[in-house]
């Protein structure tokens, strides 16, 4: 029953998040551009690193990655849906876990991978890119790193920039609250859970 309730709540949240951008179009889009939907867009990508090539794109879970950012290394994992091939844009969810799943060194590596705040987004019917970082604190440095990681995915993956969402729990909620307040233009909606 608890699992069913959790999945029902997550489904309602994703539908709510999908609807957040439905009435607004990016300023550079023509007025005839259709509103964002819950499905990946069919529009071709502009020149990006993830453009379609003759090589197949690997999908699924990419665990324990490291991105060297301006404020130091960012430990993260991400998920690409099975239909991801770089030819159409997908919504993206950036989720930050709580204190117990932050980066404390090699012993904590990948501790966020079994967290339902990450895995629930990968199991929805709506296909999306899901990113979860293990940051080292919940202050401004981690907020800058969350922004930098979000921008990295926007610039290097087939991401619909009008459907970039964020969620944070506990310490991750502190981090994402700061990130969203620093860059409200970057995130279409934010789900804040169990923190100040």
Where is each model-derived feature located?
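Active-site machinery of serine-nucleophile hydrolases
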Residues: 92, 96-147
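Extracytoplasmic/secreted proteins, especially bacterial periplasmic and envelope-associated proteins
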Residues: 91, 141-152, 174-178, 185-186
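Active-site catalytic pocket residues across diverse enzymes, especially alpha/beta-hydrolases
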Residues: 157, 183-184
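A conserved short beta-strand
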Residues: 185-196
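Gly/Ser-rich "nucleophile elbow"/oxyanion-hole loop immediately N-terminal to the catalytic nucleophile
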Residues: 83-84, 138-170
């Amino acid at each position: 029953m608890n699992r069913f309730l959790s999945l029902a709540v997550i489904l309602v949240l994703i539908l709510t998040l999908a609807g957040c951008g439905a009435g607004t179009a990016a300023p550079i889009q023509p007025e005839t551009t259709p509103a964002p939907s819950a499905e990946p867009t069919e529009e071709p990508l502009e020149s990006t690193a993830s453009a379609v090539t003759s090589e197949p794109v690997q999908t699924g879970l990419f665990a324990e990655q490291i991105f060297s950012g301006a404020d130091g290394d960012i430990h993260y994992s991400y998920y690409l849906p099975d239909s991801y091939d770089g030819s159409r844009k997908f919504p993206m969810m950036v989720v930050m876990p709580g204190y117990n799943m932050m980066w404390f060194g090699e012993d904590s590596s990948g501790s966020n991978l079994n967290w339902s705040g990450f895995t629930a987004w990968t199991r929805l019917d709506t296909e999306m890119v899901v990113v979860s970082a293990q940051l080292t604190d919940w202050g401004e440095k981690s907020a800058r790193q969350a922004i930098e990681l979000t921008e990295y995915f926007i610039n290097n993956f087939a991401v619909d920039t009008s459907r970039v969402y964020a969620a944070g729990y506990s310490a991750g909620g502190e981090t994402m609250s700061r990130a969203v307040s620093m860059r409200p233009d970057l995130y279409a909606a934010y789900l804040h859970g169990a923190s100040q």
